[in-house]
């Protein structure tokens, strides 16, 4: 139907952008960005326990038992999600200064990978490469007696960790440690062991952010003081300064030269400008990590009734793609996939 006659003559406008916003069908026809379940990578926490444990700071998330993990990955598959990333909650008794449990081929993550590949062979399995879940110091690298996070010594251990994960069946290795040169070293180590087919999704621009708090609670992986040993109180000597943008381009160029297959920006929501810059600079796929703090804020506001959770989540995920991300790591993955299916 034609709109009611205007009370005064129409303005003489050559182009009216609202013409293409008039109906849902028209808006869908000219929509520039599309969101689908295939865009999501679903982060999952796993522990040695026989039952699943709710994570207080991340409502709706669990530390999954191996049986629970298998069931949850099956649910994700049924919703159209095709990639999960695994993070271990390691028992304190297995944590050491060098994090050697990280390359134990009988450890939690290798067993979880093998189990998932047996039951859900089509699911893409991404893993995390860093020492912090395995370190009694809570850092991504080895901490010297002087309180310095050692780069090259750490990279040697990360290579062993990556190979152990690949041997278990991992499809994508995700170095989140932010040590210099680790992408090239891991690529070389994988190739030498016959894992040329295993990809690297590098945490290229990982910022020393305040948005990681709930994640560290989930894994008990925050830096911690040790008797008689100075421990850096944060990760600012290896993760990026939130004030820097050009530095992200340098990191991206290095990762691409060293053989990264996919590059990631973490956190995502407060760093949409970085996602956009990397998209302009590189032809590699770009991933954005919708991190635990971002997730927790949405959940808390939704619980109070202050926001429409469904609308806010889908808008947030769409914004990552609009900024230039091809893939999105998000704890909202299953909810978002279900909402997209509902239309």
Please report, for each region that a protein language model flagged, where it lies by residue.
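Short, Lys/Arg-enriched N-terminal segments with co-localized hydrophobic residues
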Residues: 1-10
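N-terminal amphipathic/basic leader segments beginning at the initiator methionine
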Residues: 10-31
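Alpha/beta enzyme core
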Residues: 23, 35-41, 47-343
